[in-house]
Amino acid sequence: MPSLVGSEMCIRDSFSTDVTVARSVLAEQLGAAMVMVMPPYHGATIRVPEAQIYEYFARLSDAINIPIMIQDAPVSGTPLSVPFLARMAQEIKNVAYFKIETAGAASKLRELIRVGGDAIEGPWDGEEAITLMPDLDAGATGAMTGGAYPDGIRKIVDAYAAGKRDEAAAHYEKWLPLINYENRQGGILTAKALMKAGGVIASEAGRHPFPAMHPAVREGLLDTAKRLDPMVLRWGK
């Protein structure tokens, strides 16, 4: 499996099966090595039953030749049980990767691996790595974290993969304050704020109408980051 960096992974989803398929086909044509897709949902209340979710992913799989990662995240408001996820992995050709971001992620990852067996090629952690160590202990083989400090996250994952759990835990404890700031305070603006501070980008503004980061949060974020000296703060200078 190619490394999933930058444009090699494409996030595609829509409430429309046809739109999701079209976007994913285009993503593959443009060089994506994988697509990550949530179950279909619209607004706060419109959801579909498991049968339609299954068909949604089955049709997508039939249209492309690259793996599908199902993102299991609370924002979709769609409960995805372990037996259902495992069944899709076992029966739908390209469904093989899972980004688990629900409460109790480690327990769900562990059970998904047990129930799904070899069909679960990529059980992944998410949510900015706030639960990375428990998720790795549960069997996660990868993580989709915030994009601002991969040098810090890599130290954790590399040490764990090398069988050096104590070293991985030490790195995790060191970087956890910054991970926490992103997950609980700065949110999706964290990477932009750090990149702006490091001279990588000119503006840290999110898409309107997303509110700007509060100055006090930004100050705390940068203070926390400077203690760790991530590459992002030096990259553009």
Report residues per predicted region.
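Single conserved hydrophobic/aromatic residue that forms the stacking wall/gate
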Residues: M1-G6, I11
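Alpha-helix-loop-beta-strand connector modules within alpha/beta enzyme cores
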Residues: S7-E8, I53-M69, G116
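Catalytic alpha/beta core domains of metabolic enzymes, predominantly
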Residues: R59, A73-Q185
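C-terminal alpha-helical cap/extension of soluble enzyme domains
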Residues: L136-A140, A148-K237
